[in-house]
Design a protein with these regions (language model features):
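Hydrophobic, aromatic-enriched alpha-helical segments typical of multi-pass transmembrane helices
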Residues: 2-236
């Protein structure tokens, strides 16, 4: 078990790093001046006025590729969490993980590239035509991208179910750090702010667009801390 904990601890750290790199890509998209007319993924004033920096898409791509490569360690850690006798649950996590690693990076780059095209085309074609063109392209391609979201849901919900039903070696209280909990909290903060009458801010877009990767990073770091404490307790014994 000690050797498994060392591997698990390392995998969780690498997984957290991978999620952090993916989050950098989310920041490339969301850390821009907010306008009260901003909405959705691409109807952002900073995109439409051509001020979105040319360096952002290459950075999003580079960090995304590295982050998805490190996603291998995330999936292996989630697989290792589940006790060996629960083979079907392990298989579900593995299948969802393979789909996630193979396809989530494509979605990441698709969103980034459409933001970049919005930035490039708006000064040439005008706002209304650019918005219509980009939205049509997004609606045309996203149905094909649903396979990525299917993989993500299988991993996230399957892992949450395994933790709650004690199919993992983790204590049940660890669910408070789970991706489901963190992501829901991050997503509802902008909604709560707007319900209270606050103006739209850059932070609203950061929290909503980066919630998934931030939540994964929190979950991986929480698991790394737990595994490290277990190792220390084993050394004391």
């Amino acid at each position: 078990m000690e050797n498994n904990l060392k591997t698990y601890y390392r995998d969780c750290l690498f997984g957290a790093l991978g999620a952090m790199l993916m989050f950098v890509g989310d920041l490339c998209l969301s850390v821009i001046p907010a306008s009260q007319t901003d909405s959705g993924l691409f109807l952002r004033e900073a995109y439409l006025n051509g001020s979105w920096g040319d360096w952002r898409l290459p950075l999003l791509l580079a960090t995304g590729l590295c982050g998805m490569a490190l996603g291998f360690f995330t999936i292996r850690a989630l697989y290792m969490q589940i006790n060996a006798q629960y083979r079907k649950t392990r298989l579900a996590i593995l299948i969802g993980g393979v789909i996630y690693i193979a396809s989530a990076g494509v979605v990441h780059f698709l969103i980034g590239s459409l933001a970049d095209w919005t930035n490039k085309l708006s000064p040439l074609l005008g706002r209304e035509e650019t918005i219509s063109l980009i939205q049509s392209q997004y609606e045309r391609l996203m149905p094909a991208m649903l396979i990525a979201y299917a993989g993500m849901l299988l991993v996230i919900l399957g892992n949450a179910f395994a933790v709650v039903t004690k199919k993992t070696f983790l204590p049940r209280w660890m669910i408070v750090f789970h991706m489901v909990v963190s992501e829901l909290l991050l997503i509802i903060i902008p909604d709560i702010r707007q319900a209270l009458g606050a103006e739209i801010s850059t932070w609203d877009f950061v929290l909503s667009q980066g919630s998934g990767n931030a939540a994964l990073c929190i979950w991986m770091l929480a698991n790394a801390v737990w595994a490290h404490k277990q190792q220390k307790m084993g050394e004391v014994k």
